[in-house]
Curated annotation (Swiss-Prot):
Main localization, broad class: plastid
Subunit: May interact with Ccs1.
Family named by the database record: Belongs to the CcmF/CycK/Ccl1/NrfE/CcsA family.
Membrane topology per record: Multi-pass membrane protein
Name this polypeptide is given: Cytochrome c biogenesis protein CcsA
Gene that encodes the chain: ccsA
Entry's localization field: Plastid, Chloroplast thylakoid membrane
General function of this protein: Required during biogenesis of c-type cytochromes (cytochrome c6 and cytochrome f) at the step of heme attachment.
Protein keywords: Chloroplast, Cytochrome c-type biogenesis, Membrane, Plastid, Thylakoid, Transmembrane, Transmembrane helix
GO BP field: cytochrome complex assembly
Keyword Chloroplast in annotation: yes
């Protein structure tokens, strides 16, 4: 009873903290640019990750088996994976846009598991003999991280496509690389307009007459303001492209190991390596899409929009494979949730 109460407490805390972090990241992007507020969001996710880890360990100790036997447990493991992805990406990028996307998915996943699923599906059950296999641990512990990484990568490339939607019309600077010196001036806010000393506006005001100086000063402000926006947008698109490719590559690795270990497990349980189960078929489709994306990045050297268009379809396919195929009471992977 104590373990069950502890599990419920950890479940509610680990849902509230990603919700708080989502509000913090959105607030920092929209209206409040404060590093202390941003650190509050990151600390909330770290604490949520610890709470979910404690929840999983508590439930594991209570049920005496790996927590991957039903939809509720897989959702909790999925939320745990999303939090871990955010922590790793935050260490590497320091970009709140990644936090907005990843933390929001973690919150929705955790909320659906605790609120959307019936109480009966949240109870721990005894594993059937076919599931009592070490290959099950290998298979599911690889597939769940692939469910976390592949949708994250796909959502990042969707954000990339939205960011560069009208770049040829409104953001011509995105067509070429920007000198690193300009990057350091603009992105670190060392390029001031309208200040004192040796800045542009003061040199203009000391070398010309009134109206001409005002006109030139306004033109300079508009030009460099546009340049600053375009450079920041270029930096954002480069980070989205960088992280989406690496996250999708990591997800493809998890998916490959999961498919191979699943084939061995199915052969042990039912005597066949591949049975064209609905989820097996959609797993193969997902693997082919991710393989095409990695191939055109590594072999053809494509970057930006072209591989992003291919990868953008991965998010909907992965979620359909996870929920749409799992929900009906058909197939070896079914949880029968809709029934």
């Amino acid at each position: 009873m104590i373990l069950i109460n502890l599990e419920h407490i950890l479940a509610h805390i680990s849902f509230f903290l990603p919700f708080l972090a989502t509000l913090v990241f959105w607030g920092r992007i929209v209206c409040i640019d404060n590093k202390r507020i941003g650190s509050l969001g990151n600390k909330s996710i770290i604490i949520a990750y610890i709470c979910i880890t404690g929840l999983l360990l508590t439930r594991w100790f209570h049920s005496r088996h790996l927590l991957l036997s039903n939809l509720y447990e897989s959702f909790m493991f999925l939320s745990w994976s999303f939090c871990l992805i955010h922590i790793v990406s935050e260490i590497g990028s320091k970009n709140d846009w990644l936090g907005i996307i990843i933390v929001l998915i973690a919150m929705l996943t955790h909320g659906f598991a605790t609120v959307g699923l019936p109480i009966e599906m949240q109870q721990s059950t005894v594993l059937v003999p076919a599931l009592q296999s070490h290959w099950l641990i290998m298979h599911v512990s690889m597939m769940i991280p692939s469910y976390a990484t592949l949708p994250c990568g796909s959502l990042l490339v969707i954000a990339l496509l939205i960011t560069t939607l009208n770049k040829n019309k409104n953001f011509p600077i995105l067509k070429f690389n920007v000198n690193s010196f300009i990057w350091s001036l603009i992105l670190e806010k060392k390029f001031y307009l309208g200040g004192s000393g040796g800045d542009i506006s003061s040199r203009n005001s000391s070398s010309g007459n009134g109206s001409d100086n005002d006109s030139n000063n306004n033109n300079n402000k508009k030009t460099f303001h546009s340049l600053s926006i375009d450079c920041r947008k270029l930096q954002l698109t480069q980070q989205l492209d960088y992280w989406s490719y690496r996250i999708i590559s990591l997800g493809s690795l998890f998916l490959t190991i999961g498919i191979l270990s699943g084939a061995v497990w199915v052969n042990e349980a039912w005597g066949s390596y591949w049975s064209w189960d609905p989820k097996e078929t959609w797993a193969l489709i997902t693997w082919l899409l991710s393989a095409i994306h990695i191939h055109i990045r590594m072999i053809r050297g494509w970057q930006g929009e072209k591989p992003a268009i291919i990868a953008s379809s991965g998010s909907s396919i992965v979620w359909f494979r996870y929920l749409g195929v799992n929900s009906p009471e058909k197939g070896l992977h079914s949880y029968g949730w809709l029934n």
